[in-house]
């Protein structure tokens, strides 16, 4: 399955660095970003017309939970079937898949994932 990183910013670059450094088997098609065009990290920035939403995993490479919620709703509107969130942790180093090693699956988060706040006193 091919994948796209949604977010050509700081965490998108970190995701790309993890992906290239560890030589994962997943195929990176490109980045998506609502504000950028051209290339990012030498990878093309693609549009919805460039991907098959039924066969392409979209990895949200943003850390702000409010922005993640907005992106998630956009992905649902486009009927993306394979949604992941890059969490910047390699918690299963035995896998050769970027999606299972570096991300959490979000395809079943529901209609409206809400960000949560934690307060530590």
Give the residues covered by each predicted segment.
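Short hydrophobic segments within beta-strands
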Residues: 5-6, 32, 61
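NAD(P)-binding Rossmann-fold cofactor-contacting core
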Residues: 22-40
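Hydrophobic anchor at the start of a short beta-strand
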Residues: 3, 26-29, 82-83
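Glycine-rich adenosine-cofactor-binding loop
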Residues: 1-19, 121
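Short, solvent-exposed amphipathic alpha-helical segments in soluble enzyme
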Residues: 19-24, 75-77
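Phosphate-bearing ligand-interacting subdomains
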Residues: 36-109
């Amino acid at each position: 399955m091919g994948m796209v990183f949604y977010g050509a910013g700081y965490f998108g670059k970190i995701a790309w660095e993890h992906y290239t450094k560890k030589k994962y088997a997943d195929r990176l098609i490109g980045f998506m970003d609502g504000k950028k065009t051209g290339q990012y990290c030498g990878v093309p920035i693609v549009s919805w017309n460039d991907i098959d939403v039924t066969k392409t995993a979209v990895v949200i490479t943003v850390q702000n939970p409010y922005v993640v919620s907005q992106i998630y709703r956009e992905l649902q509107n486009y009927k993306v079937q394979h949604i992941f969130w890059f969490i910047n942790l390699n918690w299963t180093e035995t896998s050769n898949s970027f999606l299972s090693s570096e991300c959490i699956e979000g395809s079943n988060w529901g209609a409206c994932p809400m960000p949560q706040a934690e307060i530590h006193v």
